[in-house]
């Protein structure tokens, strides 16, 4: 039984984002809607909006990432956005950082079931992963306010890497509160981007910080 069928605008968006790998995305969503709820990774009320609010909202940021980049997803939880990116972009090398064992176990099971050879799951707190992992891009969604997030993500970046933080309406306010820290880390550019306009009913807001 398919718990979360695709229809209408979501179908069009999913086909455009995932292309021939859409069946993998659908299988991932089924994992979210079943074992993801049973094991406490996502709330049952989210099932009707898994595609638009979570999976498409996350996957659409793939257009911001260069081909062949290494990506670390901090506080990956249910794989949002990490697994979405791994499915949409098999050229990327993903490392999912998650401290909780039950979430790590679930992520590993889903990665194995989907046959995602471009994903590694790493059990750790982000701040403890510095030195153990590094990447061209770090992603984060619903982890912490930006002012705290930069401390646990920017040190993971390799050279002139970038942080892609998925944010909401508070993005501009959070950036303003983080300016001193960004100067401390030598950030070259900070911008607030809107991704998925014309494709999603609610486009995704991303704070991009480039070192």
Residues covered by each model-derived region:
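Helix-to-beta-strand junctions that scaffold the AdoMet/dcAdoMet cofactor pocket
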Residues: 89, 157-159
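Active-site capping/gating segments
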Residues: 169-211
């Amino acid at each position: 039984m398919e718990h979360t069928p695709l229809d209408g605008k979501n179908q069009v968006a999913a086909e455009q984002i995932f292309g021939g790998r859409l069946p993998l995305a659908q299988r991932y969503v089924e994992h979210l809607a079943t074992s993801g709820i049973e094991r406490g990774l996502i709330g049952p009320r989210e099932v009707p909006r898994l595609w638009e609010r979570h999976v498409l909202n996350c996957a659409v940021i793939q257009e911001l990432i260069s081909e062949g980049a290494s990506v670390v997803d901090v506080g990956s939880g249910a794989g949002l956005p990490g697994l979405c990116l791994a499915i949409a972009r098999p050229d990327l090398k993903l490392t999912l950082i998650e401290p909780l064992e039950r979430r790590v176990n679930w992520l590993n099971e889903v990665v194995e079931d989907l046959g995602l050879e471009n994903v590694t799951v790493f059990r750790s707190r982000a701040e403890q992963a510095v030195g153990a992992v590094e990447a061209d891009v770090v992603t984060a969604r619903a982890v912490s306010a930006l002012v705290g997030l930069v401390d646990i993500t920017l040190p993971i970046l390799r050279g002139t890497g970038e942080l892609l933080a998925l944010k909401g309406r508070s993005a501009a306010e959070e950036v303003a509160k983080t300016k001193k820290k960004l100067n401390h880390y030598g950030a070259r550019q900070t911008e607030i981007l809107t991704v998925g306009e014309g494709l999603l009913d609610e486009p995704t807001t991303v704070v991009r910080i480039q070192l």
